[in-house]
Every structure is written in C-alpha cells, then in structure tokens.
C-alpha cells in the first residue's frame, strides 16, 4: 500500500466572509444616495419646466428656432399687435456664442498650460503655494466681477490691441472691420472669458502634470535631458488628455457665461464674423 493511499489531506471547507456595515457607514450611504438622486430630480425638473414653457415656441417655429437668424417681436411697446408676424430664431446667437468661446479657449489654453508647467517644475515652493491659492481663489470669483473689471479696465486696453490687430492683420477677414468701432466687440468678450477660464484649465492641467510617472522623469534626466526636454518628452504627452479635458471644462464655462458677456459685448441679433467690430451675438 502506497503512502498516497494511506495519507489523507484535509481540505478546509470554503467560508463565506460577511461584514456588517456600521451605522455611520449606512448613514453616509443614505446621505450620498439622496444627494445624487436629488441632483437628478432637480435637473429633470428644470428640463421639464423648460420643455413645457418652450413648447409653444418650438411647435410654432420648429427647427427654424435654431437655424433662423432673425429675432423680431410683433408686439409694440404699447401692447398692441404689429403688422408683421413675430419671428424668433437663435441661430445668430448660437454662432456668436461659439465664436466668443473659441476666442476664449484659443487665448486661455496656452496661458493655462504654461502656468501649470511653471507651477509644477519651475516655481519655488513658497511662490508655488501662493500662486496656487490665488488661482483657486480666482476660480471662485463671481462673473459680475470679471464683467465690471472688463468694462472699466480691460476695454480701453482691448481697444488698443484690437486696433493693432486690425492695422497689421486686416487682410485676414476675421480682423477686418467695416467701421472703426472696436469697443464691446467679440474679441474683448473673448478675452474676458479667457481670463475667467484660465483658473479652471490651469488647476486641471497642474493636477494632471503632477501625476506624471516619476520613474520616467528620472529616466529622462538620467539620459541627459534638460528640464524642458523632459517636459516635452514625458510630461506633456502624459498630460495631453487632461489638458483637453480642462479645455472642455473651460469651453463649457465660456459658452454658458451670461453676466460678464452681457457687460462687455454689444449684443445684436445678427451673425458677425468680424471679431474686432463692436457688435456680436450671444445667447446671453
């Protein structure tokens, strides 16, 4: 008789591991669940309210409400009906919103990426902490402050830069104007929106760049790379997706801004492709 036949190995039976959540864990789960559900309910209620209130307009105008450029109300100032029929279209406003938002992103993204790289790899520790606090504080500023600052401080300087762009780049249709009116233009509105989006994009980019793999950074230095060469070869490729995400967040705020844009932009219900001219459309 062999040893294997006489020896029996005791195999333990599988056990079920169960945990009983603590009372604080259950309370936390209920609170978080209620918070998430309430957010969805509020968003659904807003969408339902807008749909109900705008159903008459959408049913009368159809897709023309989005594609049409005219906005005319047949109701006179005294409350009587006019001779022409009312026409409502937000096409020009949508195009103007996209133009100002793209100007803001084109100005804000390079400045934000450069600021994030400076904070992570060039700024001294004491200066870094102070600048990070200032940038985070700017992200919490209400939009009315940016609008008033843009109207009272930025607009005179913005007119000067707009005149320079028109003087040297007027051969580009975007920078050509039919009349020398440079105040309250889409360009100035885009600059104000860029200043508003810079803190958001900078914060996101800084956090992404800080997550770059340390072993790759050290390997780049070990191969003799300079700091800028290391940033180009390691940090920027690693954080490209995060920068794009931050730019999308900034674009979302730029497209959804109202008070600041209304303060510095001369709103007209027509498409203006000349960004230096003091007139432009916007959903605001």
Language-model regions: role of each:
Residues 254-284:
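Glycine-rich helix-loop "coupling/hinge" segments at transmembrane-helix boundaries
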Residues 141, 201-205, 212, 221, ...:
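Transmembrane alpha-helices
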Residues 88-118, 247:
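Transmembrane alpha-helix signature in integral membrane proteins
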Residues 60-91, 146-195, 265-267, 277:
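Membrane-interfacial helix termini and adjacent extracytoplasmic/periplasmic loops
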Residues 108-111, 135-143, 180-206, 237, ...:
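Faces of alpha-helical transmembrane segments in polytopic inner-membrane proteins
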Residues 29, 111-150:
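Cytoplasmic-entry segments and transmembrane alpha-helices of multi-pass inner-membrane transporters
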Residues 1-36:
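Transmembrane alpha-helical segments of polytopic membrane transport and secretion proteins
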Residues 35-52:
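N-terminal signal-anchor transmembrane alpha helix
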């Amino acid at each position: 008789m062999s040893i294997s036949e006489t020896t029996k190995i005791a195999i333990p039976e599988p056990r079920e591991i169960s945990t009983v959540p603590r009372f604080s864990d259950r309370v936390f789960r209920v609170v978080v669940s209620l918070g998430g559900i309430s957010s969805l309910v509020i968003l659904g209620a807003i969408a339902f309210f807008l749909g109900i209130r705008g159903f008459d307009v959408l049913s009368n105008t159809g897709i023309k409400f989005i594609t049409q450029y005219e906005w005319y109300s047949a109701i006179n100032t005294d409350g009587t009906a006019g001779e022409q029929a009312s026409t409502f279209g937000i096409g020009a406003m949508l195009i103007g919103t996209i133009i100002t938002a793209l100007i803001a992103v084109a100005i804000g993204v390079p400045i934000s990426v450069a600021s994030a790289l400076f904070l992570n790899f060039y700024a001294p520790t004491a200066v870094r902490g102070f600048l990070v606090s200032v940038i985070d504080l700017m992200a919490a500023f209400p939009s009315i402050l940016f609008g008033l600052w843009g109207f009272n401080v930025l607009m005179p300087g913005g007119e000067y830069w707009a005149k320079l762009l028109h003087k040297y780049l007027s051969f580009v249709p975007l920078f050509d104007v039919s009349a020398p009116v440079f105040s309250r233009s889409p360009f100035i509105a885009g600059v104000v929106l860029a200043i508003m989006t810079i803190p958001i994009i900078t914060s996101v980019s800084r956090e992404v760049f800080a997550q770059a793999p340390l072993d790759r950074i050290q390997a780049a230095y070990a191969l003799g790379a300079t700091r800028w060469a290391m940033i180009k070869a390691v940090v920027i490729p690693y954080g490209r997706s995060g920068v794009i995400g931050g730019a999308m967040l900034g674009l979302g705020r730029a497209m959804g801004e109202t008070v600041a844009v209304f303060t510095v932009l001369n709103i007209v219900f027509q498409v203006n492709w000349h960004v230096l001219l003091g007139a432009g459309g916007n959903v605001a």
